[in-house]
Design a protein with these regions (language model features):
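Short, electropositive alpha-helical surface patch
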Residues: 75-81, 120, 169-187
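Hydrophobic "anchor" residues
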Residues: 238-240
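Conserved strand-turn element in the central/C-terminal portion of the radical SAM core barrel
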Residues: 89, 144-172
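Non-cysteine beta-strand/loop elements that form the S-adenosyl-L-methionine
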Residues: 111-123, 187-194
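Short, small/polar residue-rich loop motifs at catalytic or cofactor-binding pockets
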Residues: 224-228
């Protein structure tokens, strides 16, 4: 596969567990309804080896709904990636979990360039609890101070924060942006929320802090560009064509235990799924209202 035909990164879901209950995320609705899983380490390695053979150089551990740092094997995975030919690693986390073993793995990154994105909202104790659904504001702020030391001492590790705006802000978001600057983190504001393909439409519209902040939907004219850019291998080894919002696996076209990702990426199933975007009747259900959709 030529480098121009490779996805921007291969996404790997190493766990399906999250430790926050964000009001703008679908995770709280499914928490407790499915068994907690962690990707088997041999499967994880085989997925990366296959991707490297294709010429792949970038991995993301951002799942659809979960937090990579809750994965009990995350430190081992970071060590493995750092020892592999993978050049770049990135993923998003709420950064509630920053256990000593994870901290050590961050400190020891010496080969792979690693950029962690931290997604959060509610920039004081009270608003954080209301919007992130857990009382972990102080813990996250302390974890960020620890991360700052690593970012400033290890040039392979960088961090950026996505600061999600909300109604009722009394200046705390700007103070958080200053905190980022002072601690060596990049940051940007996110003004809008999406509805998880319509699954969260009522929740977002009716939330006093988020209402009126829904991302615009684009008309479906061509295959979604995400199908070219963000393939996800789930904790069970399923190849899900979209990393973004496919909570229930409607866009799964195979499993890497049966067929390697390298074959599925150039196979007929992927092309057939993309073709479904040309007709409203065949458009996957989850894609019909998705605000993450961008035509390729």
């Amino acid at each position: 596969v030529s480098s121009s035909e490779l996805p921007g990164a291969l996404y790997i879901e190493t766990t399906n567990l999250c430790n926050a209950r964000c009001v703008f995320c679908y995770y709280p609705k499914v928490h407790g309804t499915m068994p907690v899983k962690y990707m088997n380490m041999d499967l994880f390695k085989s997925v990366i080896e296959d991707y490297v053979q294709m010429g792949g150089k970038e991995i993301s551990l951002t799942p659809t709904i979960a937090d990579p740092l809750v994965d009990k094997l995350i430190h081992e995975r970071l060590e493995y990636i750092d020892s592999s030919p993978i050049k770049k690693l990135r993923f998003y986390s709420n950064f509630i979990s920053f256990r000593p073993k994870i901290r050590e793995a961050f400190q020891n990154m010496s080969n792979t360039k690693f950029d962690i994105g931290i997604s959060m909202t509610g920039f004081n104790k009270e608003m954080y609890h209301k919007l992130m659904g857990v009382d972990q504001y102080d813990k996250v702020m302390n974890n960020l101070r620890e991360l700052s030391k690593i970012v400033q001492s290890n040039s392979n590790v960088s961090a950026h924060l996505v600061l999600r705006k909300y109604k009722g802000d009394e200046g705390e978001t700007d103070r958080m942006a200053k905190f980022c600057r002072d601690h060596g983190f990049k940051s940007h504001f996110e003004e809008v929320y999406d509805t998880w393909g319509g699954l969260m439409e009522e929740d977002i519209k009716n939330n006093e802090y988020l209402k009126g902040r829904i991302r615009k939907r684009l008309p479906r004219t061509k295959p979604c560009e995400v199908t070219y850019r963000k393939p996800l291998i789930t904790v069970d080894g399923d190849y899900k064509v979209c990393e973004c919002r496919d909570v229930f696996g409607e866009l799964i076209i195979g499993n890497v235990k049966d067929t390697p990702f390298s074959e599925m990426w150039v196979g007929p199933e992927l092309e057939a799924l993309r073709q479904r975007f040309y007709n409203e009747d065949t458009l996957p259900e989850i894609c019909k209202k998705c605000e993450m959709y961008v035509p390729k």
